């Protein structure tokens, strides 16, 4: 699997996970209809299935995926929640992506 394909899969996986968790949050905290739980369940099932598409050890996939997840979560914070990230949020993203790169590109 190419690096671009892997990163794209990580991004789609992160979005599925965040949507799957955000919708119940809307129901529990913001008064959204319980019907949001149906797409939330579908999104979380999609998330679990997407994790199976990665061709390496699950622990390594989860560790590398974490860097992309944090990045997408900060983008979500800004784009969906309307909260501009602080410089420390961005510094954390850089550190997470650096860690992800070490895990992904280390010689095996």
Swiss-Prot record:
The chain crosses the membrane at residues 3-23, 31-51, 63-83, 87-107. One of its GO terms (cellular component) is plasma membrane. It holds the Pfam family UPF0060. InterPro entries: UPF0060. It is a multi-pass membrane protein. It is found in: Cell inner membrane. It comes from the Bacteria. Keywords: Cell inner membrane, Cell membrane, Membrane, Transmembrane, Transmembrane helix. Its main location: membrane. Belongs to the UPF0060 family. HAMAP family: UPF0060. This is UPF0060 membrane protein Sputw3181_1172. It comes from Shewanella sp. (strain W3-18-1).
